[in-house]
From Swiss-Prot:
<comment type="similarity">
    <text>Belongs to the MnmG family.</text>
</comment>
<comment type="subunit">
    <text>Homodimer. Heterotetramer of two MnmE and two MnmG subunits.</text>
</comment>
<dbReference type="InterPro" id="IPR020595">
    <property type="entry name" value="MnmG-rel_CS"/>
</dbReference>
<dbReference type="Pfam" id="PF01134">
    <property type="entry name" value="GIDA"/>
</dbReference>
<feature type="binding site">
    <location>
        <position position="181"/>
    </location>
    <ligand>
        <name>FAD</name>
    </ligand>
</feature>
<dbReference type="InterPro" id="IPR004416">
    <property type="entry name" value="MnmG"/>
</dbReference>
<keyword id="KW-0963">Cytoplasm</keyword>
<dbReference type="InterPro" id="IPR047001">
    <property type="entry name" value="MnmG_C_subdom"/>
</dbReference>
<dbReference type="GO" id="GO:0030488">
    <property type="term" value="P:tRNA methylation"/>
</dbReference>
<dbReference type="Pfam" id="PF13932">
    <property type="entry name" value="SAM_GIDA_C"/>
</dbReference>
<feature type="binding site">
    <location>
        <position position="370"/>
    </location>
    <ligand>
        <name>FAD</name>
    </ligand>
</feature>
<dbReference type="GO" id="GO:0005829">
    <property type="term" value="C:cytosol"/>
</dbReference>
<feature type="binding site">
    <location>
        <begin position="273"/>
        <end position="287"/>
    </location>
    <ligand>
        <name>NAD(+)</name>
    </ligand>
</feature>
<feature type="binding site">
    <location>
        <position position="122"/>
    </location>
    <ligand>
        <name>FAD</name>
    </ligand>
</feature>
<dbReference type="GO" id="GO:0050660">
    <property type="term" value="F:flavin adenine dinucleotide binding"/>
</dbReference>
<dbReference type="InterPro" id="IPR002218">
    <property type="entry name" value="MnmG-rel"/>
</dbReference>
<keyword id="KW-0285">Flavoprotein</keyword>
C-alpha cells in the first residue's frame, strides 16, 4: 500500500497550489485528479486577476506559488485596472490563452519535485479515533486503491455532488462533460460536516467567425504589460484585443419573456449564486431600470476560434440563448459552440475550519477553494497555498501554524472572513473588505510575504536573494531622495510645478504631491534613472502614501494587540460567567483563537469580550500557580 505525507484531491487552482506548496516544503505529496488533462483547467472565464484578486495572485507568487508565473506565460491581454485611482486599489488582470495556461500548469505539476500525480476518482476517506480525537488515515479510490496519508486536502471545486442545469435539462456533472464527486459528498455527510448548496454559471462559448467586430469598441491591453510574478521579466506572447458590445431593450425583452424557462427561476431559485457576478437573467430582473449591460468579447487564445462573452452567464435553454444573443450588436449571426449553463454543488460551512484551513472535527483534514464557499480562481489559489503550507508544516513539530492576519495579506482577510463569519453565498474578495489596504497593495506583496515564506522553506533561496537585493535598492533610493533638499525656486528652474511658498522639501516629500512622479523628479536627480523601474515605482508609491501610514500603522498596532491575545483552544466558554447562552453557543461553534477573532463574530458584545478577558487573566494565573 502507498503511503504519503500529504494527499491533495483535485487538480484545479486550489489543488495545484496546495500540492506544490506541500511538496516545496519537503512533504511527500500525492495529487489525485480525475484526469491529468484537466489539471489547471480554467473552467469559466479565461482570465486571471482583477481588483483585489490580482493582489491575491501576487501574494501567492510572493510565497513561490504557481499562478502568477503561469499566467505570465499565457497572457494575451494584460492591464492594470483602476490605474487612474490610487495604487491601493490597482488590480492587475490578464486575459489568458486558455490552452497555453493549462499546458503550462500541467508541465509544472507533472514534473514537480516531491509530487506524484495519480489519475483516479476518490470515493471515500477513513479516519482513526484515539482519546475522542479523530485523525485522517486513508483515501479510497473508485477502483478500491487504499492510500495511507498523514494529511488530506480536499479541493473539489464545483464537483462535490455537482449538477449542471440548462433550462429544464439537468445532469450530474462538476463541469461540462465531467462526472461529479458523489462518494466524497456522502463521506462528509457521514462525518457530520454542515453542508450547503451554492451555484455559479458560465456563458455560452461563441464562434469567432460568426461575429461582426466592425463597429464594436476595441479593448486593448496596456502598451507595456506588467507581469504578475516577481520572477518574470516580461510578457512574451503577442497581445491581442478584446471587444466591447452591450445588451439592449430587445435583449431584455427576450429574457423577460423567457424567465420562467431559466433554471435560475425554477430548480435553482432557492440556491444562492454569486452576488457580484450575476447571470444576465438576474441582471435584467434586479436592475429593471437599466436598458443595457456591457458584454466583453474575450478571445480564448491566440489560435482559438472561441470567444468568451463576459457578462452574460445564463441558465436559459439553448433556443433562448440564441434568440437573446442575436439581438446584441455584432452577434446578429452568431453560432454557439457550447451552451451556457449553471452548476450547483455542495460546500461546507467554513466556520468549521481553523485559520490554517484544517477542520475542527478531524485532525489532518483540510479544505480549500470553492468547497469553502468562495468563487474565483484567485480566491481558490490563495486558500490552496495556505492549506498546502500548513499541512506540510504540521508534519514537523518545530513549526508553528502559518496564519496570515488581516494586516498581512488579502489572503488573510479572506480566510478570516470565512472562518469567523462564514458565508451563505459565493464569497468574492474586494478591496473594501480589507481594513489596511494602504499596506496591502499589489505592488508590495513580495515585501510583505516572501521573507515569511522563506522562514518556513516554502520560498526558494533564489527568490529570497532577489527580494533582499530589491529591499536594499529601495532603502538606498529612499535615503537618496530624503537627503536631497530643494526649494520652490530651484524646482521652478526645472519646470516642476510647486507652490512658491518658500518651504524647503526633500525630493521624497515632493513625490507625495499630486502630479509629481519619478519622471519629473529625475530632472533634478539623475540618480533615479540608475535604479530598476519597479524599485523606483515602489519608492514613489511609498512616498505618496507616507502621510497616511502613521494612522494606518496605529490601527494595525491596536489590531495586533487583540490578535496576539490568544484564547486557548481547549477553553470551555460555558464556564465564563456573564455570557449569554446564545453567545456561548457561537463561541463554542467557531472556537476563536484570539480576542480579535472573537470580537469579529457577529453578535459578540463588548461586554462579552470584557468577560472573556477577565476569564483569561484568571485562567493564566491559575495555570502558572
Amino acid at each position: 500500500m502507498d503511503h504519503y505525507d500529504v494527499v491533495v484531491i483535485g487538480g484545479g487552482h486550489a489543488g495545484c497550489e496546495a500540492a506544490a506548496a506541500a511538496a516545496r516544503i519537503g512533504a511527500k505529496t500525492l495529487l489525485i485528479t480525475h484526469s491529468t488533462s484537466t489539471i489547471g483547467e480554467m473552467s469559466c472565464n479565461p482570465a486571471i486577476g482583477g481588483i483585489a484578486k490580482g493582489t491575491v495572485v501576487r501574494e501567492v507568487d510572493a510565497l513561490d506559488g504557481l499562478m502568477g508565473k503561469v499566467i505570465d506565460k499565457a497572457s494575451i491581454n494584460s492591464s492594470i485596472l483602476n490605474r487612474s485611482k490610487g495604487p491601493a486599489v490597482w488590480g492587475p488582470r490578464a486575459q489568458a490563452d486558455r490552452k497555453i495556461y493549462k499546458n503550462t500548469m500541467q508541465d509544472i505539476i507533472l514534473n514537480y519535485p516531491n509530487l506524484t500525480v495519480l489519475e483516479a476518482s476518490v470515493e471515500d476517506f477513513t479516519i482513526t479515533e484515539k482519546d475522542e480525537k479523530f485523525t485522517v488515515e486513508t483515501v479510497i479510490t473508485s477502483d478500491q486503491q487504499v492510500i495511507y496519508t498523514k494529511k488530506l486536502i480536499l479541493t473539489t471545486g464545483t464537483f462535490l455532488q455537482g449538477t449542471i442545469h440548462i433550462g429544464s435539462y439537468n445532469t450530474p456533472a462538476g463541469r461540462f462533460g465531467e462526472q461529479p464527486s458523489i462518494g466524497l459528498a456522502k463521506t462528509l455527510e457521514k462525518y457530520n460536516f454542515k453542508l450547503g448548496r451554492l451555484r455559479t454559471g458560465t456563458p455560452p462559448r461563441l464562434d469567432i467567425n460568426s461575429i461582426n467586430f466592425s463597429g464594436l469598441q476595441e479593448q486593448k491591453g496596456d502598451s507595456e504589460p506588467s507581469p504578475f510574478s516577481y520572477m518574470s521579466q516580461s510578457i512574451d506572447l503577442p497581445q491581442i484585443s478584446c471587444y466591447l458590445t452591450a445588451t439592449n431593450t430587445r435583449t431584455h425583452e427576450v429574457i423577460k419573456n423567457n424567465l420562467h424557462r431559466a433554471a435560475a427561476s425554477n430548480s435553482l431559485k432557492d440556491i444562492k449564486a454569486p452576488r457580484y457576478c450575476p447571470s444576465i437573467e438576474e441582471k435584467v430582473r434586479r436592475f429593471s431600470e437599466r436598458n443595457s449591460h456591457q458584454v466583453f468579447l474575450e478571445p480564448e487564445g491566440l489560435d482559438s476560434n472561441i470567444i468568451y462573452p463576459n457578462g452574460i452567464t445564463t441558465s436559459s435553454p439553448l433556443d433562448v440563448q440564441y434568440e437573446m444573443l442575436k439581438t446584441i450588436p455584432g452577434l446578429e449571426k452568431v453560432n454557439i459552440i457550447r451552451s451556457g449553463y449553471s452548476v450547483e454543488y455542495n460546500f461546507i460551512d467554513p466556520r468549521e475550519l481553523y485559520h490554517t484551513l484544517e477542520t475542527k472535527k478531524i485532525s489532518g483534514l483540510y479544505f480549500a477553494g470553492q468547497i469553502n464557499g468562495t468563487t474565483g480562481y484567485e480566491e481558490a489559489a490563495g486558500q490552496g497555498i495556505i492549506a498546502g503550507i500548513n499541512a506540510a508544516l504540521s508534519l514537523n513539530s518545530k513549526y508553528e501554524p502559518f496564519i496570515l492576519k488581516r494586516s498581512d495579506a488579502y489572503i488573510g482577510v479572506m480566510i478570516d472572513d470565512l472562518v469567523t463569519l462564514g458565508t451563505s453565498e459565493p464569497y468574492r474578495l474586494f478591496t473594501s473588505r480589507a481594513e489596511y489596504r494602504l499596506r496591502l497593495r499589489s505592488d508590495n506583496a513580495d515585501l510583505r510575504l516572501t521573507e515569511l515564506g522563506y522562514q518556513i522553506s516554502v520560498v526558494s533561496s533564489k527568490r529570497y536573494t532577489i527580494l533582499k537585493n530589491k529591499k536594499q535598492e529601495i532603502i538606498t533610493l529612499t535615503n537618496i531622495l530624503k537627503n536631497i533638499i530643494t526649494t520652490p525656486t530651484q524646482l521652478a528652474r526645472h519646470n516642476i510645478p510647486i507652490s512658491q511658498d518658500g518651504v524647503r522639501r526633500s525630493i521624497f516629500d515632493l513625490l507625495g504631491h499630486p502630479n509629481i512622479n519619478m519622471e519629473i523628479v529625475s530632472r533634478i536627480c539623475n540618480t533615479v534613472k540608475e535604479f530598476n523601474k519597479n524599485v523606483a515605482e515602489q519608492v514613489a508609491i511609498e512616498a505618496k502614501y507616507a502621510p497616511y501610514f502613521d494612522r494606518q500603522d496605529a490601527d494595525i498596532k491596536a489590531f495586533l494587540e487583540e490578535e496576539n491575545t490568544h484564547i486557548p483552544h481547549n477553553i470551555e466558554f460555558s464556564q465564563i460567567h456573564g455570557l449569554s447562552k446564545e453567545i456561548q453557543e457561537k463561541l463554542e461553534y467557531i472556537k476563536p483563537l484570539s480576542i480579535g477573532s472573537a470580537r469579529r463574530i457577529p453578535g459578540i458584545t463588548p461586554a462579552a469580550i470584557t468577560n472573556i478577558l477577565i476569564y483569561l487573566r484568571y485562567y493564566k494565573s491559575k495555570k502558572t500557580s
